[in-house]
Amino acid sequence: MPLISSLAVTTPIAILSALPQEQRGLMALLQQPHKITHASRDFWLGNLHGQPVVLALSKIGKVAAATTTTALIERFGVRRIVFTGVAGGLGQGVKVGDVVVATEFVQHDLDASPLFPRYEVPLYGRARFHCDPALSSLLFEASSKALAHESLASHGYSGACVHRGLIASGDRFVCGADESRILRDAMAGAGHEVLAVEMEGAAIAQVCLDYGVPFAVMRTISDRADDSAHVDFPDFVEAVASRYAHAIIERFLIQLSN
């Protein structure tokens, strides 16, 4: 049975973060925080910018993210999920410091051929899983406003853009130029023009489809999924991605209240 928080008169919104650095800014502003530990995860209930929320870390990888998402729906009764994180840029024109708001997700490491076409999820009859259009549009608008804000523009990414499109997920950190090229070309050959690559989103998308829960995802591009990815990643998350997540979610929740 879902746990309905006494802090919230309406169903809470889940705000998922991929990494602790991204969650810190949100935690600092959480009003009436209340921690519940479930499934070896800490879930923080409270209010943020006028909205009842549950904050959680997805943990890393598809299975971990699916477990967290299921717990949010089953245990806390959330009916909307928003996920912030970082990703490697794959698409042409997608550069470090940009943001990609997902329209769909695909698993780049799923291959049940010859029983099913490569990338197709068995028994679902599809390879791609759609994000909620209305929620994603709000997130796109919030991202655009946040990136235009002086405090972010002055952080060295004044030319940062917001993109919309397909993101690929898989259980490996793509960090080589050759690996990145092979992945991009293979997916394009199957009709999947991917803008970015990460490790959780497709699993969240599949769980949300199963439960009929709307969700939206934004990913800050931390690297180009090439040979420098492992070097760029830690510094970028600490210095930039955490500020992006905080600023974008703030604007998103304010827009939702209006």
Q: What function would you assign to each model-found segment?
A:
Residues 54-59, 166-168, 218:
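Active-site-proximal beta-strand elements of phosphoester/diester hydrolases
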Residues 78-82:
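Proline-aspartate-enriched helix->loop->beta-strand connector
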